[in-house]
Each structure stands twice: as structure tokens, then as C-alpha cells.
Swiss-Prot record:
Chain residues that bind substrate: K149, D181, T216, K217, F218, E219
Enzymatic reactions: guanosine(46) in tRNA + S-adenosyl-L-methionine = N(7)-methylguanosine(46) in tRNA + S-adenosyl-L-homocysteine
Biological role: Catalyzes the formation of N(7)-methylguanine at position 46 (m7G46) in tRNA.
Organism of derivation: Neisseria meningitidis serogroup A / serotype 4A (strain DSM 15465 / Z2491)
Identification of the protein by name: tRNA (guanine-N(7)-)-methyltransferase
Keywords: Methyltransferase, S-adenosyl-L-methionine, Transferase, tRNA processing
GO cellular component: tRNA methyltransferase complex
Molecular function via GO: tRNA (guanine(46)-N7)-methyltransferase activity
Active-site residues, Swiss-Prot/TrEMBL: D145
Keyword Electron transport: no
Record-linked NCBIfam families: tRNA (guanosine(46)-N7)-methyltransferase TrmB (TIGR00091)
Pfam families to which the protein is assigned, alphabetical: Methyltransf_4 (PF02390)
Entry's family note: Belongs to the class I-like SAM-binding methyltransferase superfamily. TrmB family.
EC numbers for this chain: 2.1.1.33
Length: 238
């Protein structure tokens, strides 16, 4: 997909879904030649096209390893590193940002990673239509847009209705791991997850950063600006 075609696709999506609640913000962006080449040559091996019917993840990965859903991977650097650290776990990574998709595919090739599959679609629709109940061992959502202004808080991804959609997809014993560098959003995340009887916090409030999660470029920048970082890890118990 060329950069022009990408922008046209985004415009068409907005026209067809004028009032949809989405997991992302469409934005104009430039894809490098290397990112475009990665999409052109690697999508057939590591990309999964959206379908409005349940998918067999074991078949798509060619393995029965544990499955982790990652929503919003940015440029994919942290995703690739997590997959490298956890080679016996499969990662379904979803984002709509073309350059990020291309970059993650490039990282998959460079690092010889076989345990990542990439989707370029709205994660809400993927969760609603493609993921079977009890198909996930974990869910990662790292640094979602905090929508700082109060009037925009309704656009935040981490709200009770979306968590309610995610929960059936998790196996009992599976986990949700969230991270943010916006304290007020961290408080909201804690309140939302704590409101579900079927979720149990693995810490008193905020969790230590698990060993598998590397520091992201976004996170490092925030720390330089004096921001804190909050991780939350909740386990499904019923």
C-alpha cells in the first residue's frame, strides 16, 4: 500500500464509520521505503487480514503456544523485544499506523522472530468479531492515548465497556497488563479493572514493571520529562 493509498483508505474509513468508538486515532503519516518493502514482502508470512468471523489463532500461528494480544504497538520496537524475550509465546499485535506496521514487520525479519503476527485494523472490531472466547492467555495495552483534556476522556480506550468485551476472550488465569505515564489515567485504569469481580489485582495497587516489558522510547522520553510510569497487572479468576 502506498502512502497516498494509505491516506485514501483512512479517509474512506472515516466516511464509513463517522461515529464509531475506535481503539486508535487516524493520522497522516509517511512510510519509508524500507517499511513499505517490509509490508510488500512480509505481510503474506506475518500479516493477518481482518475477517468478521472467528479465527483459529493456533492455525494462523502454526502453533499451540500461549497467545498474547497486544493493542497499539507504535513502531513495534517493544513488541519485537518482548517476543524475543518470550520465544515460547505467540503475540498478535494490532495497530493501524502504517509506518509502525511496516517497521514491526522489518524487525520481525531482522530478528528472525516467528512468534508474532500483525494486524492492521481497529482492535475493537477484532476483539468483537475475530477472537474466540477463551483464546487468549494475556492482553497487553501499553501507553494508550491518555486524551488529556477532560472533555476528551470519553475517547479513552480503557473504559468498562471495552474491558467487558475483552474479558470473555481471556482464559481463566489469563492476565491484562496495562501501562501509562499519565497518573490520572492510571487511576482510572485501576478503578475500571477493580470494578470487575472476575479480575484480581496481582499487586496492592500498581504492579512492578514485569521483566518481559522493556522500556519504550515513549516511556524513556516521559521519564526525562519527570513523568512517572504505572503498570497494572490483573488476572482473570472467573
Amino acid at each position: 500500500m502506498t502512502d497516498t493509498a494509505e491516506n485514501q483508505t483512512q479517509n474512506n474509513w472515516q466516511a464509513e464509520h463517522p461515529r464509531s468508538i475506535r481503539s486508535f486515532v487516524l493520522r497522516q503519516s509517511h512510510m519509508t521505503a524500507a517499511q513499505q518493502r517490509a509490508i510488500d514482502t512480509l505481510w503474506g508470512s506475518f500479516g493477518i487480514d481482518y475477517q468478521a468471523t472467528p479465527a483459529d489463532l493456533d492455525a494462523r500461528f502454526g502453533s499451540s503456544r500461549p497467545k498474547i494480544l497486544e493493542i497499539g504497538f507504535g513502531m513495534g520496537t517493544a513488541t519485537a523485544e518482548i517476543a524475543r524475550r518470550l520465544p515460547e509465546t505467540d503475540f498478535l499485535a494490532i495497530d493501524v499506523h502504517g509506518p509502525g506496521v511496516g517497521n514491526l514487520l522489518k524487525l520481525i525479519e531482522e530478528n528472525h522472530l516467528e512468534n508474532i503476527r500483525v494486524m492492521r485494523h481497529d482492535a475493537v472490531e477484532v476483539v468483537e468479531n475475530m477472537l474466540q472466547d477463551g483464546s487468549l492467555d494475556g492482553i497487553h495495552i501499553f501507553f494508550p492515548d491518555p486524551w488529556h483534556k477532560k472533555r476528551h476522556h470519553k475517547r479513552r480506550l480503557i473504559q468498562a465497556p471495552f474491558i467487558a468485551k475483552l474479558l470473555p476472550k481471556l482464559k481463566t488465569g489469563g492476565y491484562i497488563h496495562l501501562a501509562t505515564d499519565w497518573e490520572e489515567y492510571a487511576q482510572q485504569m485501576l478503578e475500571v479493572l477493580s470494578s470487575f469481580d472476575s479480575l484480581q489485582n496481582t499487586a496492592a495497587d500498581y504492579a512492578p514493571t514485569p521483566d518481559y516489558r522493556p522500556e519504550t522510547k515513549f516511556e524513556a522520553r516521559g521519564k526525562r520529562l519527570g513523568h512517572g510510569v504505572w503498570d497494572l497487572v490483573f488476572k482473570r479468576i472467573g
